[in-house]
């Protein structure tokens, strides 16, 4: 029935899809003038009519049309067909079953659900300027795809598809993609290059090798494996291609962009393409109002130039976000877009050092842990599973037993390494992502000290969440990405879609206020003093990597959150003398740039000095806890290895641990003989009681198969129940038959109700020379015995 309905719907759509529309699908036709410019504007909240144009995106932007399929390397053609439409050369452009499944999902979910399509259908969809999400559009696309297959050759369709798909980083079409990522033509692409490009159209942002290298490498591996599975490449080619390096970010040639905020424009363009597709963004008549404030943008550049004066010295990136609505107000991704299009604000993932510690503290607060919890500030060894992680403080300075608040102000590595172990790296990753960090983060113990890769935009967004009293602000239009667009208008239809701010709670207001109160102390009396403003309170944190290769200051007021990174973009070069002959730390150049920018930015915004919400009194309760049975539990008075933790009243563990007086660990003795198991238990010391369980025929006896308890802890001297295999008393054990005559062996096995299988070998004639299973295992019905008997009769033996 479903296929019948699908066929009817398809037929109706086919009638409507007139042949005259086919020429309009040709990329050359589109490029010749069937396009409406898209325009990107800066924000102008005082007068929308005076919005400044940041960029104009035309249909031929970053696109070079190829005329013949022979201009594309055969391996590139194979790669894209393998991963996007393996039956491309077999079908007629439409998969009726696939359409039927998609229609059924649309009906079932009461909306339109995009599914997999053929290359022909994808090309038709890309070529359409109309991009509304309707069932009718789906059927119409399918009908046009079928018509296209009747008029065009497969090679022409594939070439048109490759000419129109978007590969990310401004590369529209296969020729521009080859030039952008590999500085060569589409005809020169190799297998690993082709596999990388073939994997990009599915999600150019997610699989971008300049921003998400691990995801990009996994996607390339998937394409290569698909080609191997389809017999397109050999195992040797697969291995060599997987080992090939990805293009480096600074090797990728991005299209030139003019205007006052080129790095920001490229970032916005990528977000729009992820939402609307390249066909609508380039030449689709979109008028996009962004969040960028050009006065703040110019100020950000000027602040960096004022502090970083040394030619050939380090570079800086700066991002400013209004915490109240999540809007990105300024973004400096480099000093010269002409020299390098690599965006330091969004693509440079560098270690944040101690500026990541507030995220660790935020994780603790979410678990109900109070900043009053105390740890010892001293060198510590953390068991990281595969190695011991030795943690020390900067310049060997320790402050003794201290709470989390003071440890933050003094940027104490030893304390925050212990806190990382306590709250757990996986929970820190969850908190970081919830705060707005989109970078991939590994849940290693070193995450607590900032040994992870993040970018300035991510860090600004996380701190903006702190500034907004624990609420991360996204937009309604572009999902959980940073809010860089105010609204999108269509010049074709007049439709206006606003990207309204939407707040998502991550921390409670109380938790965020506690964190902000602590970070204010960092600026007043800690490592961030150079960022202090004379007319208003500031909260923030410095960050410096061990080798002085990266330096950060991330801070905020209630009206603006700003991250500043300083370092050398092309290498992890130690900045040992760049601060007046001294090393560059987060409290030096980054803090100075931050202050230079904020002091003027807040005045230009006419932001009156505003105090943060006071942390107030938060009642706490100390609990003595222990890690037991996979969770923290309350000490019952007998637990070893406990610690005291201050929790917000009503939070923290409530279940009591089961610990014992004179507690010892119960060893695992399953699989051991009775004697060995008893000896292992006695060494603790623990006793043993034996419980016999029937052994299966053919299995060993006298071995422990179960114990109660299985691990855990008991008081010394307690008895552990051991379940030991015993033979069935009716049958006993299999006897040793080697050396017996065949007649005697059969008689003995007959008493056990066993009938052996006989094979012959060499040895003393007429005797058993080998038996299976061996003597000593449990006997019983159903046991398959095999005897190897030497040929001849015993009497024939000399």
Residue ranges of predicted features:
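Short active-site loop at a secondary-structure junction
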Residues: 63-72, 314-315, 338-359, 371-377, ...
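Active-site SXXK
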Residues: 78-81, 85, 222, 227, ...
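Short, well-structured active-site flanking segments
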Residues: 89-99, 172-175, 234-237, 339-342, ...
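Ligand-recognition elements built from short beta-strands and adjacent flexible loops
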Residues: 608-798
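Juxtamembrane regions of bacterial inner-membrane/periplasmic proteins
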Residues: 1-311, 328-329, 378, 418
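Mid-domain, small-residue-enriched loop/turn segments at the edges of structured enzyme/sensor domains
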Residues: 140, 388-392, 424-461, 476-481
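Conserved catalytic neighborhood of penicillin-recognizing serine enzymes
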Residues: 108-133, 252-260, 369-428, 468, ...
């Amino acid at each position: 029935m479903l296929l019948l309905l699908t066929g009817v719907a398809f037929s109706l759509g086919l009638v409507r899809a007139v042949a005259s529309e086919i020429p309009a699908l040709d990329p050359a036709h589109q490029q010749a003038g069937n396009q409406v410019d898209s325009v990107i504007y800066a924000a102008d909240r005082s007068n929308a009519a005076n919005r400044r144009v940041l960029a104009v995106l035309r249909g031929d932007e970053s696109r070079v049309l190829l005329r013949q399929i022979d201009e594309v390397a055969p391996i590139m053609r194979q790669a894209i067909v393998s991963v996007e439409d393996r039956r491309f050369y077999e079908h007629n452009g439409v998969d009726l079953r696939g359409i039927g499944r998609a229609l059924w999902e649309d009906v079932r979910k009461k909306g339109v659900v995009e599914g997999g399509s053929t290359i022909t259908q994808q090309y038709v969809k890309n070529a359409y300027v109309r991009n509304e999400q309707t069932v009718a559009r789906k059927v119409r696309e399918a009908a046009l795809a079928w018509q296209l297959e009747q008029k065009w050759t497969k090679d022409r369709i594939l070439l048109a598809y490759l000419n129109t798909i978007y590969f990310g980083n401004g590369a529209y079409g296969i020729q521009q993609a080859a030039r952008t990522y590999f500085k060569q033509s589409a005809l020169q692409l190799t297998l690993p290059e082709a596999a990388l490009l073939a994997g990009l159209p599915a999600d150019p942002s997610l699989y971008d090798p300049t921003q998400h290298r691990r995801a990009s490498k996994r996607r390339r591996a998937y394409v290569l494996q698909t080609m191997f599975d389809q017999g397109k490449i050999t195992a040797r080619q697969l291995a060599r291609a997987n080992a090939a390096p990805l293009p480096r970010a600074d090797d990728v040639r991005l299209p030139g962009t003019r205007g006052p905020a080129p790095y920001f424009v490229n970032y916005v363009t990528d977000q729009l393409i992820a939402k609307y597709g390249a066909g609508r963004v380039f030449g689709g008549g979109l008028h996009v109002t962004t969040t960028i404030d050009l006065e703040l943008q110019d100020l950000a550049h000027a602040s960096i130039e004022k502090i970083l004066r040394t030619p050939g010295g380090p570079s800086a990136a700066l991002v400013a976000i209004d915490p109240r609505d999540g809007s990105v107000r300024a973004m400096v991704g480099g000093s010269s877009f002409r020299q390098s299009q690599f965006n330091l604000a969004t693509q440079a993932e560098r270690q944040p050092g101690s500026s990541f510690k507030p995220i660790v503290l935020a994780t603790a607060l979410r678990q109900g842990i109070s900043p009053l919890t105390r740890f010892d500030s001293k060198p510590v060894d953390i068991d990281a599973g595969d190695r011991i992680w030795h943690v020390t403080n900067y310049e060997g300075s320790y402050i003794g037993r201290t709470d989390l608040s003071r440890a933050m102000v003094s940027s104490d590595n030893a304390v925050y390494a212990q806190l990382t172990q306590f709250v757990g790296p996986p929970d820190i990753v969850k908190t970081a992502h919830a705060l707005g960090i989109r970078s991939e983060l590994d849940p290693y113990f070193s995450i607590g000290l900032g040994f992870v890769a993040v970018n300035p935009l991510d860090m600004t967004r996380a701190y903006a969440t702190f500034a907004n009293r624990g609420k991360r602000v996204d937009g309604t239009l572009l999902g959980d990405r940073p809010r860089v667009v105010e609204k999108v208008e269509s010049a074709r239809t007049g439709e206006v879609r606003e990207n309204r701010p939407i707040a998502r709670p991550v921390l409670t207001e109380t938790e965020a206020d506690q964190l902000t109160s602590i970070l204010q102390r960092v600026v007043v009396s800690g490592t961030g003093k150079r960022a202090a403003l004379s007319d208003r309170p500031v909260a923030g944190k410095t960050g410096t990597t061990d080798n002085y290769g990266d330096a950060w200051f991330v801070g905020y007021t209630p009206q603006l959150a700003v991250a500043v990174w300083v370092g050398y973009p092309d290498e992890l070069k130690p900045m040992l003398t760049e601060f007046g002959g001294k090393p560059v730390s987060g409290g030096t150049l980054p803090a100075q740039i931050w202050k230079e920018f904020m002091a003027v930015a807040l005045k230009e915004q006419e932001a009156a000095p505003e105090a943060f919400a006071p942390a107030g009194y938060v009642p706490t309760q100390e609990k003595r806890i222990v890690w037991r049975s996979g969770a923290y539990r309350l000490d019952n008075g007998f637990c070893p290895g406990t610690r005291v933790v201050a929790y917000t009243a009503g939070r923290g563990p409530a279940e009591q641990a089961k610990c014992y007086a004179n507690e010892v660990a119960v060893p695992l003795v399953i699989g051991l003989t009775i004697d060995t198991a008893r000896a292992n238990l006695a060494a603790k010391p623990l006793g043993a009681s034996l419980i016999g369980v029937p052994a299966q025929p053919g299995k060993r006896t006298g071995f422990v198969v179960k114990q109660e308890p299985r691990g855990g802890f008991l008081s010394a001297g307690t008895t552990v129940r051991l379940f030991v295999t015993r033979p069935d008393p009716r049958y006993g054990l299999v006897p040793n038959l080697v050396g017996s005559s065949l007649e005697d062996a059969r008689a003995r096995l007959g008493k056990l109700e066993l009938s052996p299988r006989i094979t012959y070998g060499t040895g003393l004639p007429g005797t058993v020379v080998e038996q299976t299973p061996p003597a000593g295992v449990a006997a019983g019905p159903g046991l398959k015995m095999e005897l190897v008997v030497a040929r001849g009769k015993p009497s024939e033996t000399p």
